[in-house]
From Swiss-Prot:
Pfam family of the protein (one): LpxD
Family as reported in the entry's similarity comment: Belongs to the transferase hexapeptide repeat family. LpxD subfamily.
Origin organism lineage: Bacteria, Pseudomonadati, Pseudomonadota, Alphaproteobacteria, Rickettsiales
Protein name in UniProt: UDP-3-O-acylglucosamine N-acyltransferase
Superkingdom in the source lineage: Bacteria
Key words, A-Z: Acyltransferase, Lipid A biosynthesis, Lipid biosynthesis, Lipid metabolism, Repeat, Transferase
Species annotation: Rickettsia conorii (strain ATCC VR-613 / Malish 7)
PANTHER family per UniProt: UDP-3-O-ACYLGLUCOSAMINE N-ACYLTRANSFERASE, UDP-3-O-ACYLGLUCOSAMINE N-ACYLTRANSFERASE 1, MITOCHONDRIAL-RELATED
Active site (UniProt): H253
Reported function: Catalyzes the N-acylation of UDP-3-O-acylglucosamine using 3-hydroxyacyl-ACP as the acyl donor. Is involved in the biosynthesis of lipid A, a phosphorylated glycolipid that anchors the lipopolysaccharide to the outer membrane of the cell.
Length: 346
């Protein structure tokens, strides 16, 4: 449920205005201009004043009984629905829903163009226009922060860091040895640019290897809460444009992640591995060091990757193997256990 403590409802909105706003919608030829939509709700909870959406076929049954005034459905949807619900066909209902959220709601919290008195900003730092620097933020020498950026309470921006325009850095983030592009979002508690995990063992003693590289983050990247991205030793750690990195992800020194890749929570990528463009790593995936994951490859949740993966391949299991082989192994193992248990009972 959306709380008015945090978000302001901008409704009601005319259904005709919603259709115009979403653009790529196939709607019935005649829609009453006076239909007013007050809110967005899931199918099960929607009232006659609400709009809903169907992006997962698992919930198709609820479309028969929903009370929603309108529902966004897949373009090819031909199933049953409440006759009182106006169906709006979209190529991607979930994407349309995401746009509607911003059409109906605005956050209550605002960020004025201001540097709070408790913030410590070095004289040599450059702060762009219309920036908000929150309480107890520390910005060290020679930092550059682009226009329209937000640095929330308690964050630390180390010497020489460069952050682009329209950044949103949430609370208690620390950033060192990094160059960050435009339109980047970094959620609370993330740590970027710290020393990598590198040691050389000599005569029983683990000697630290200095990491003198940096972290480079491209444009329009989102980094989740409490994620850690280590700087490289000699080679930089690089996150390319459009990447989405979930909470609690560990990215080791010198890792390179290609454009548009998605890394899900609790994944760990060991040093010097390369992830290609538009790859997907499911939750709790482990990638060993010095590997190459090809463009468009996918690793199922909890996959343990110990060797290179070719472009476009889908793997699962630990050690990770082609996904269909993994499914076959799981079925065979289940059958073997069933047979073994039957023999034991006899």
């Amino acid at each position: 449920m959306v709380s008015s403590n945090f978000y302001k409802n901008l409704g009601p909105r005319k259904l005709t205005a919603i259709i115009d706003f979403l653009h790529d919608i196939i709607a019935p030829p005649k829609i009453h201009e006076d239909i007013a939509i007050h809110d967005i709700k899931i199918l099960q909870e929607a009232s006659p004043n609400d709009i809903s959406f169907l992006s997962n076929p698992k919930y198709s049954e609820f479309l028969k009984t929903t009370k929603a005034a309108a529902c966004i459905v897949p373009k090819n949807f031909t199933g049953e629905a409440n006759p009182n619900t106006v169906l709006l066909h979209a190529q991607n209902p979930y994407f349309a829903y995401g746009k509607l959220i911003d059409f109906f709601y605005a956050p209550i919290k605002s960020y004025p163009a201001k540097i709070m008195k408790s913030a410590i900003v070095a004289d040599s730092a450059t702060i762009g226009k219309n920036c908000y620097i929150g309480h107890n933020v520390v910005i060290e020498d020679d930092v550059i922060i682009g226009d329209n950026s937000i640095i929330e309470a308690g964050s630390f921006i180390g010497r020489g860091v460069n952050i682009g325009r329209n950044a949103r850095i949430e609370q208690h983030v620390s950033i060192n040895y990094a160059i960050i592009g435009d339109d980047v979002v970094i959620l609370a508690g993330a740590k970027i640019g710290q020393d990598g995990f590198g040691f050389s063992t000599e005569k029983g003693v683990h000697h630290k290897i200095s990491h003198i590289g940096i972290v480079k983050i491209g444009n329009n990247v989102e980094i989740g809460a409490n994620t850690t991205i280590d700087r490289g030793s000699l080679q930089d750690t690089i996150i390319k444009d459009l990447c989405r990195i979930d909470n609690l992800v560990q990215i080791g020194h010198g890792v390179k992640i290609g454009k548009g890749s998605i890394i899900v929570a609790q994944t760990g990528i060991a040093g010097s591995s390369t992830i290609g463009k538009y790859c997907t790593l499911g939750g709790q995936v482990g990638i060993a060091g010095h590997l190459n994951i090809g463009d468009g490859a996918q690793v199922a949740a909890q996959g343990g990757v110990a060797q290179n993966i070719e472009a476009g391949k889908i793997v699962g299991g630990s050690p990770a193997i082609p996904i269909m082989d993994w499914h076959r192994q799981s079925i065979i193992m289940k059958q073997l256990l069933k047979t073994s248990n039957s023999k034991l009972k006899k």
